[in-house]
Amino acid sequence: MCIRDSKYLVEHLYSPVRRGLMDEIDWNDRLIGIKGSRGVGKTTFLLDYAREHFGADNKECLYINLNHFYFTERTLVDFASEFRAKGGKVLLIDQVFKYSGWSKELRYCYDNFTDLKIIFSGSSVMRLKDENPDLSGKVVSYNLRGFSFREFFNLMSGNSFPAYTFGEILVDHQEIAKGICSVGKPMAYFQDYLHHGFYPFFLEKRNFSENLLKTMNMMLEVDVLYIKQIEQSYLPKLRKLLYLLATSAPCTPNVSQLSKDIETSRATVMNYIKYLADARLMNILYPVGESFPKKPSKVYMYNSNLMYPIRPMEVNMPVSYTHLTLPTT
């Protein structure tokens, strides 16, 4: 069943954008974790790797989802052992946190199946090394983010502009801008990017706003409550906190008032804000030298797309243009 599922998914994969992270990863490592917020394309990224490095028919690489009912009675260790015995070399594991004891079994596979490479995906809320000592010093983790404006612009305009380093932009920004604008008009796509360009699922033939709203709720219900083991009864408080922060962001949070609004302690409010940031729903900014559990100086939405489902009638994003001028020496 798993082999048929993997082959089908790789064969029918629609992935028009090759993510830059693909070239940043050292694929020689034997245990690789791909973290990212819900909706940024972690599953697609794993399948992209399979298609690019092995193809759909090569049984040396296999994609599995640990949220499958198959793994309610079959252990990951047993499955990996059998896969390896049949010639398997690379195991791509999705939804790893849905499997009880996943970190211990990954460590067992790492220690005992030295000819097997494991690449797994996980939520941005997960602390792979801090909260999973079994993996400390073994796993190499990377973060997959949503589309950059460059990726969105390339996709929508049919171009293939490369990424530039900050140093290259500082030194040669005028020529870079001229080269881009000579074949495309990036600002014609910018408002669309602010509205729906961060999450790759805007390409699906579904209502984007409804899909994003469902994704945000899943971030709260699964990525925060499930992973952080918070009781379901506290979900309304977490949802209300997100709404209060979103409708006032960017802001310096009044923790005392927020604790009254959601009827919980100041310490719990601070924890919730941290969890929202871990889930990539919010960004939190601290003064230099400070960090959690201190109160952040500013709280704002993680990306502009998230503002529209919460404040659809209030979002106003004027676009300003500023030319970068460097001081002469």
Regions found by a protein language model. Give the residues of each.
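Conserved small/polar residues in nucleotide/adenosyl-binding loops
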Residues: 1-5, 322-328
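N-terminal pre-Walker A segment at the start of P-loop NTPase domains
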Residues: 4-21
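Hydrophobic anchor at the beta1->P-loop junction of P-loop NTPases
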Residues: 34
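Conserved lysine of the Walker
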Residues: 42
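Hydrophobic positions on the alpha1 helix immediately C-terminal to the Walker A/P-loop
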Residues: 45
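Short glycine-rich substrate-engagement loop in P-loop NTPases that contacts/grips substrate
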Residues: 62-86
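Interdomain motor-coupling "hinge/lid" segment immediately C-terminal to the ATP-binding subdomain
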Residues: 131-235
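Accessory nucleic acid-recognition modules appended to NTPase machines
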Residues: 211-324
